[in-house]
């Protein structure tokens, strides 16, 4: 079954559904499908339609770290789900401060609109004021994004790219990635993938 492991990881209901479908239709173990269990063909549209997340539901943003730590960036409302794997999540800021790396003022009532796409090595968050003013854009480089019914998950790869309201683009936190490689937390090939992804984003912004 295409996406076998990825679907089962979504929820207990999804896991049970996969077991049932494979018991009826056969699986790779039965030799009935050459690509059964291949998560490269994960059927995002069908899976989210059946198990979520759905528009109007809340999901957490689970920000993993290579050292094993996990940080929640809060919960947001799913405002759009596209069968091609794209997911829009909107959050409201509840405190004043400064946007990390962007440097602009953060005000309570600001809105963060994040676009995730299943399997992509980065995601983008645009910050806007309650009046619609642009506060800036933050692009996080990470391991391939996975959208589950209750959370969007990935592992942060340190290096990121920001775009400020005046159009200035800056790549940030290369030093943190270098340190993670030196500490053995991130392999050299993975680090190179992160750097090349950041370079492509920097050019595109």
Regions found by a protein language model. Name each.
Residues 1-205:
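Acidic, polar-rich N-terminal leader regions of halophilic archaeal proteins
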């Amino acid at each position: 079954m295409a996406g076998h492991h990825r679907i089962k990881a979504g929820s207990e209901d999804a896991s049970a559904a996969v077991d049932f479908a494979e018991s009826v239709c056969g699986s790779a173990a039965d030799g009935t499908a050459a690509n059964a269990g291949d998560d490269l063909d994960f059927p995002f549209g069908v899976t989210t339609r059946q198990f979520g997340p759905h528009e109007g539901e809340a999901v957490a943003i689970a920000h993993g770290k290579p050292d094993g730590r996990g940080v929640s960036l809060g919960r947001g409302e799913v405002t759009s789900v596209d069968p091609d794997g794209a997911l829009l999540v909107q959050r409201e800021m509840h405190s004043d401060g400064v946007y990390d790396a962007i440097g602009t003022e953060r005000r309570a009532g600001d809105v963060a609109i994040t676009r995730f796409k299943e399997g992509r090595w980065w995601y983008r968050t645009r910050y806007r004021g309650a009046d619609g003013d642009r506060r800036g854009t933050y692009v996080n480089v990470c391991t391939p994004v996975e959208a589950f019914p209750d959370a969007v998950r990935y592992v942060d790869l340190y290096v990121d790219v920001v775009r400020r309201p005046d159009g200035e683009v800056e790549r940030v936190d290369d030093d943190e990635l270098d340190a993670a490689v030196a500490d053995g937390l991130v392999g050299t090939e993975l680090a190179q993938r992160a750097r090349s992804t950041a370079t492509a984003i920097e050019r595109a912004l």
